[in-house]
Amino acid sequence: SHAFPFVRIRINLLDSLRGPALVLRLIPQTILTMEQLKLPEVLTELAGRPKGLILVTGPTGSGKSTTLAAMIDWINRNETRHILTIEDPVEFVHDSKRSLIRHREVGMHTLKFHNALRAALREDPDVILVGEIRDQETLSTALEAAQTGHLVFGTLHTNSAVKTVERVLGMFPPEEQDSVRRSLSE
């Protein structure tokens, strides 16, 4: 992504049958609060939890990143926490307020989400945002982080709670799915 004084732009360049193509996604510089977005109060309660795994799911363009940015902003304004974001690319840039926030970009600061998440466990964050949980390694490490006292946020591209659970379990071999199901229910 690239920053300009009034907006950040996520740029994807690609080649196609008819030649090069460009996709631009505008990311506002100002992070809207949960109140401004009129998000349910339960999200504030979840953001205030000391540990756990919070998955924000939905199709492309449904507001997953905006919702997570608002939740991280709430923590930053109301809690004294060490927050680490791992994104590809970094979308919403938070300035530290009551919390210390550090951003890591996949491809620039780390090779993969999994590598950054594994390293994060040694960096003593309280809150970890994983921009997108794409594979079993990343999900396993996110579950481990949540079980060892971190508050972990992540996104998945699914359309319902049932599809989310199916997708999560489907990332694991059948012999591991019962264990993962128990981990998710804790």
What are these regions (language model features)?
Residues 1-186:
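Short, flexible helix-loop junctions that flank or precede catalytic/ligand sites
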